[in-house]
Amino acid sequence: MKNNKKGFTLVELLAVIVILAIIALIATPIILNVIDDAKTNAAKNSAYGYIDALEKANAQDMLSSESINVLSGAYTIDESGKLMHDSAEVAVKFKGTKPTSGTLTYADGKLSSGSSITVDGKKFTSDADGKLTLSK
């Protein structure tokens, strides 16, 4: 009589499980880093969007009024996302995650070095060119 046993042995199945576990151990930190980088980039894009919205609001204000008010001084963002300048709230139309804190300092209409903005718990600081970098 012919013996036709088909299937995998217990040792073969255990070997496959061990290999899959090793692959999972290697892949998990990589995937988590990709997710964290995506969250950081999303927060950075929201920060840039908020800054652009402020600058656009100022440009619209200059077009609709007869005076030219170049962005200057410190603009402070409170916990609720309100932007304050000289004790007055500045209206900023913005879609995205609002910042929770920060101080945007402008000189002659240009974002100054050392300005900061926090979005989703990630604090970004500007350099002399207005580029935002994540503060550790």
PLM features per residue range, with description:
Residues 5-31:
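N-terminal single-pass transmembrane signal-anchor helix
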Residues 33-51:
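Aliphatic-rich helix starts adjacent to a transmembrane/signal segment
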Residues 56-136:
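Periplasmic/extracellular, small/polar-rich flexible segments of pilin-like filament-forming proteins
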Residues 1-2:
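N-terminal hydrophobic targeting signals that begin at the initiator methionine
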Residues 5, 39-42, 58:
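Short coil/turn residues that cap or connect secondary-structure elements
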Residues 12, 46, 51, 62-63:
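Enrichment for repetitive, rod-forming helical segments
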